Amino acid sequence: MPLTSAFRAVDNDPGIIVWRIEKMELALVPVSAHGNFYEGDCYVILSTRRVASLLSQDIHFWIGKDSSQDEQSCAAIYTTQLDDYLGGSPVQHREVQYHESDTFRGYFKQGIIYKQGGVASGMKHVETNTYDVKRLLHVKGKRNIRATEVEMSWDSFNRGDVFLLDLGKVIIQWNGPESNSGERLKAMLLAKDIRDRERGGRAKIGVIEGDKEAASPELMKVLQDTLGRRSIIKPTVPDEIIDQKQKSTIMLYHISDSAGQLAVTEVATRPLVQDLLNHDDCYILDQSGTKIYVWKGKGATKAEKQAAMSKALGFIKMKSYPSSTNVETVNDGAESAMFKQLFQKWSVKDQTMGLGKTFSIGKIAKVFQDKFDVTLLHTKPEVAAQERMVDDGNGKVEVWRIENLELVPVEYQWYGFFYGGDCYLVLYTYEVNGKPHHILYIWQGRHASQDELAASAYQAVEVDRQFDGAAVQVRVRMGTEPRHFMAIFKGKLVIFEGGTSRKGNAEPDPPVRLFQIHGNDKSNTKAVEVPAFASSLNSNDVFLLRTQAEHYLWYGKGSSGDERAMAKELASLLCDGSENTVAEGQEPAEFWDLLGGKTPYANDKRLQQEILDVQSRLFECSNKTGQFVVTEITDFTQDDLNPTDVMLLDTWDQVFLWIGAEANATEKESALATAQQYLHTHPSGRDPDTPILIIKQGFEPPIFTGWFLAWDPNIWSAGKTYEQLKEELGDAAAIMRITADMKNATLSLNSNDSEPKYYPIAVLLKNQNQELPEDVNPAKKENYLSEQDFVSVFGITRGQFAALPGWKQLQMKKEKGLF
């Protein structure tokens, strides 16, 4: 096939395009067959996404376990050619059967099916409405499932997985006694997907619970008629698990082949910084053998760039890693989110918008906090998410201090004063549409004892119980106060380095105290105590020097008028308005004497705000096996928040733990520890004090929902459980009738009776009270549209429609009058 013809299907529309290698040429795979892969073949997949206004593309070449070396080489060559065709910006991935990346598996929400054979044995990707099928599928996984065609025998079964017996017109799901509810639900959704995409919605599905086979005698008879007499089922086969700690070990290598041989030089290990990458070179980043990245600098030659994948394979061989090791090649300036998150920070020069504005007190770089319209926070949750604000901070506030491991109310006049030797709970209550919502901040001082830290976490759970677990819990380590926390105290937040505010404290105040005052309005201003030395000063901020006799408010030459006004207001709180204002460069000698003498400090010109280029990422977290495992959900939507799971949303400067209503007690209790372990094992060397917010299902604030497109607060009440879906599948008697017909030698599966029956659009637009044909299911009218009419009505193919979430399908059907 000519190259231009092969890539004619490429456009800028979001979605995926799949080609199979057939006789060393690219053949387009129909959308209805996406997610089906023959084990004897190789494939090339192009994924196109829009991130804001930018186009993001990934090219994967997939290697079946029985494919030939020639086919594998051909797929790699086409991947390189497609990359060139698209201007060299896509990220390239090498995928091997059974070892696919989370990104790849995420494209196929209903699962991946491995089919025996390949193009060499005459296997074709068939279109919809084919019933001449007889196979047994072994389904593994809970989040992104994989189904493999296995021998049609009871010997293929085990107690821990789910199996689908697919007989064309009938699909029977057998659930291993030790499989979990998530696996059973995903397998059922796969069975429904096969029914709807491949059988035009006309196959029947039955379910057998492996520990209650006697309750399904008719279905068991079908299984035994097909597979023979039931034998003893094998024990559970444990899944291969890669510990998150293993993923956290990373090494950066410089690679060259100038002497004709692959030369690898170790550059650095965790934590990595972006400046290590030279734009004229190529590098390999080794994630402990679990994944290999190749970074191609802009200045590298075309030959070096094209050889990137072969260099990675040579590196894998040199390291004696498995040949199935996942490989990703990235281009300088077009790096994937997965690659960038392996570095301590990833900045983009000349970028004016971005996420992750994280800075520490004392650094010369400044954050310019833009003012925003608070009325947008609930009408546009994406604004709340970007600003990290649920409202303007005008709700009700209650503050307690941990004292003798118990909660002691803080007097109102001391609200906003926090001491580094203490821990505090701050309960904030606000209303949305007349309904109260709660945020519980757990502020932990840098010098608080371990007992106090533990008590603050325990007491937070107790306070949360008063609201039936509806409060959002936010752990705040001293110095990492979120913007909303500062807004609560209206520009009057003061953080003392040590000491305590409890009564009877015998520790005297230091004779000299220096506070750095940061912020330009009441939503982002705080005073933080810093060491009382001249070296603590910064020309871009305002500082308050306080003694028992004199008070100086020092204006750095880079501070703005708004910053000075807010600092003066806060200083008057600490000094009763008796402070002397001093401009940088006009300090009296006494000022320097109080700071121990004049010494150099950060006085360079104001630096540009640094924009960290990070993307929000969603993970499923688990430590059920004794190993901490996180699985990323790519291109996530609200549908990916499973009520049986604990999910982690990482927005870099905040980490959200979302707890599903049906999550088990152990996972709920260990939620905070899970988030802390995630930060600790993150390969980039993340700040362990990153704020952690614990969110309960049904009580999500806009700072969380804003990270999801088109958040629907009613999605779970409208959603269906595994048992409800099972009830909808119909009775076993219908399956018995079909299987009896299938055994009848006079019945041809390709006869006119088995052909799908279609009706004109006008007929199907009638409601139930009108004259719908008797054989039309009013809840599934779309199944009776011809392929041409289906595209005409919905604007997409039947396969694309089947891949949509259930709520989206229902919405489209209502809009078109087909429900």
Swiss-Prot record:
<dbReference type="InterPro" id="IPR029006">
    <property type="entry name" value="ADF-H/Gelsolin-like_dom_sf"/>
</dbReference>
<dbReference type="GO" id="GO:0042995">
    <property type="term" value="C:cell projection"/>
</dbReference>
<dbReference type="InterPro" id="IPR036886">
    <property type="entry name" value="Villin_headpiece_dom_sf"/>
</dbReference>
<dbReference type="GO" id="GO:0051016">
    <property type="term" value="P:barbed-end actin filament capping"/>
</dbReference>
<keyword id="KW-0206">Cytoskeleton</keyword>
<keyword id="KW-0965">Cell junction</keyword>
<feature type="region of interest" description="Core">
    <location>
        <begin position="1"/>
        <end position="731"/>
    </location>
</feature>
<feature type="binding site">
    <location>
        <begin position="109"/>
        <end position="116"/>
    </location>
    <ligand>
        <name>a 1,2-diacyl-sn-glycero-3-phospho-(1D-myo-inositol-4,5-bisphosphate)</name>
    </ligand>
</feature>
<dbReference type="GO" id="GO:0015629">
    <property type="term" value="C:actin cytoskeleton"/>
</dbReference>
<dbReference type="GO" id="GO:0051015">
    <property type="term" value="F:actin filament binding"/>
</dbReference>
<dbReference type="GO" id="GO:0071933">
    <property type="term" value="F:Arp2/3 complex binding"/>
</dbReference>
<comment type="subunit">
    <text>Associates (via C-terminus) with F-actin. Interacts with SCARF1. Interacts with PLCE1. Interacts with ACTR2 and ACTR3; associates with the ARP2/3 complex.</text>
</comment>
<feature type="region of interest" description="Required for interaction with F-actin">
    <location>
        <begin position="628"/>
        <end position="819"/>
    </location>
</feature>
<dbReference type="Pfam" id="PF02209">
    <property type="entry name" value="VHP"/>
</dbReference>
<dbReference type="InterPro" id="IPR003128">
    <property type="entry name" value="Villin_headpiece"/>
</dbReference>
<dbReference type="GO" id="GO:0030027">
    <property type="term" value="C:lamellipodium"/>
</dbReference>
<dbReference type="GO" id="GO:0051014">
    <property type="term" value="P:actin filament severing"/>
</dbReference>
<dbReference type="GO" id="GO:0030424">
    <property type="term" value="C:axon"/>
</dbReference>
<dbReference type="InterPro" id="IPR007123">
    <property type="entry name" value="Gelsolin-like_dom"/>
</dbReference>
<dbReference type="GO" id="GO:0010976">
    <property type="term" value="P:positive regulation of neuron projection development"/>
</dbReference>
<dbReference type="GO" id="GO:0007015">
    <property type="term" value="P:actin filament organization"/>
</dbReference>
<dbReference type="GO" id="GO:0060271">
    <property type="term" value="P:cilium assembly"/>
</dbReference>
<comment type="function">
    <text>Ca(2+)-regulated actin-binding protein which plays an important role in actin bundling. May have a unique function in the morphogenesis of neuronal cells which form ganglia. Required for SREC1-mediated regulation of neurite-like outgrowth. Plays a role in regenerative sensory axon outgrowth and remodeling processes after peripheral injury in neonates. Involved in the formation of long fine actin-containing filopodia-like structures in fibroblast. Plays a role in ciliogenesis.</text>
</comment>
<dbReference type="GO" id="GO:0005884">
    <property type="term" value="C:actin filament"/>
</dbReference>
<feature type="repeat" description="Gelsolin-like 1">
    <location>
        <begin position="24"/>
        <end position="73"/>
    </location>
</feature>
<feature type="modified residue" description="Phosphotyrosine">
    <location>
        <position position="85"/>
    </location>
</feature>
<keyword id="KW-0117">Actin capping</keyword>
<feature type="repeat" description="Gelsolin-like 5">
    <location>
        <begin position="525"/>
        <end position="565"/>
    </location>
</feature>
<keyword id="KW-0677">Repeat</keyword>
<feature type="repeat" description="Gelsolin-like 3">
    <location>
        <begin position="262"/>
        <end position="306"/>
    </location>
</feature>
<keyword id="KW-0106">Calcium</keyword>
<feature type="repeat" description="Gelsolin-like 6">
    <location>
        <begin position="628"/>
        <end position="669"/>
    </location>
</feature>
<dbReference type="GO" id="GO:0003779">
    <property type="term" value="F:actin binding"/>
</dbReference>
<feature type="repeat" description="Gelsolin-like 2">
    <location>
        <begin position="145"/>
        <end position="185"/>
    </location>
</feature>
<feature type="region of interest" description="Headpiece">
    <location>
        <begin position="731"/>
        <end position="819"/>
    </location>
</feature>
<feature type="domain" description="HP">
    <location>
        <begin position="753"/>
        <end position="819"/>
    </location>
</feature>
<feature type="repeat" description="Gelsolin-like 4">
    <location>
        <begin position="403"/>
        <end position="454"/>
    </location>
</feature>
<dbReference type="InterPro" id="IPR036180">
    <property type="entry name" value="Gelsolin-like_dom_sf"/>
</dbReference>
<keyword id="KW-0225">Disease variant</keyword>
<protein>
    <recommendedName>
        <fullName>Advillin</fullName>
    </recommendedName>
</protein>
<keyword id="KW-0009">Actin-binding</keyword>
<keyword id="KW-0966">Cell projection</keyword>
